[in-house]
């Protein structure tokens, strides 16, 4: 096969008016014989009606061969670099691809410079390719990966899921309902007026939970106002950063592993006490972040317990004064332990 390609190159070079190649100059007579045969065959094809041979060898059907072949005519269309929009066309149409059909890895020794340059090395093939930065997700998923995700989804038609799984929906609903109830209660305590606007989502259940929280939370604040004031002075809450630091103290309330509705309602009641303080120092914008911090601590650390107790429905059903007062005493002791009855709590939230 290599011999045929070599003879084709020699014949083309002589036909275009060039000198014989170095490796084939010694066998000029045999090469010349082959050249005459090739020429006769091409002429016969043109006479029969196939102008394709003339177009490939001479440049156009039925036309006389050109005296010389332009150097760029031996060049081929280089493959476009990876990531490029189109091919990097550097020469004439693909009819002059004398070596493309055989896919040789390197040009023959007799090949001249322009034709040899047309064969790309692996380094040239990757020219223009920019490696993707580590940790960056590709903008478009590969087709096979996208099909695999679609086929493994819950839909039978291969479409991607548009809604989260049921467990995730339940978690989101618990957080949403908790945030709505706690945020509404804290704002009402700060302004001193009830909000008549209906609650969204599970309205009836949330409304009952809010009414229960108003009744129980207001009683906790009245009975333990002095203790709440002492804790507020130690916390020294003045801005949103101080409010965010409060979440560490809330987590400590449940550090002994004991959870009950008494501790939860005491924590929310103290949050309402802090909301009143924020209103008095013109920091009402910090009330919503405070409600989010309380909700995050409760739902994130006590989700399993809340689900087992049926969430806010269980809160509405719960009302035992003994258990409530026992939970309140434990919360106050926990705050005192964090504060160290001194500057320990102030140091903790810095």
Curated annotation (Swiss-Prot):
Cleaved by CASP3 during apoptosis, yielding a pro-apoptotic C-terminal fragment. Rapidly degraded in the absence of phosphorylation in the PEST region. It is a single-pass membrane protein. Keywords: Apoptosis, Cytoplasm, Developmental protein, Differentiation, Isopeptide bond, Membrane, Mitochondrion, Nucleus, Phosphoprotein, Transmembrane, Transmembrane helix, Ubl conjugation. A motif (BH2) lies at residues 304-319. The record marks 127-128, 157-158 as: Cleavage. One of its GO terms (biological process) is extrinsic apoptotic signaling pathway in absence of ligand. A motif (BH3) lies at residues 209-223. GO terms for cellular component: cytosol; membrane; mitochondrial outer membrane; nucleoplasm. The modification Phosphoserine is found at residues 121, 159, 162. Gene3D superfamilies: Blc2-like (1.10.437.10). GO terms for molecular function: channel activity. Residues 104-175 are annotated as: PEST-like. There is a cross-link at residues 5, 40, 136, 194, 197 (Glycyl lysine isopeptide (Lys-Gly) (interchain with G-Cter in ubiquitin)). InterPro entries: Apop_reg_Mc1, Bcl-2-like_sf, Bcl-2_BH1-3, Bcl-2_fam, Bcl2-like, Bcl2_BH1_motif_CS, Bcl2_BH2_motif_CS, Bcl2_BH3_motif_CS. Involved in the regulation of apoptosis versus cell survival, and in the maintenance of viability but not of proliferation. Mediates its effects by interactions with a number of other regulators of apoptosis. This is Induced myeloid leukemia cell differentiation protein Mcl-1 homolog. It comes from Felis catus. The lineage of its organism: Eukaryota, Metazoa, Chordata, Craniata, Vertebrata. The gene is MCL1.
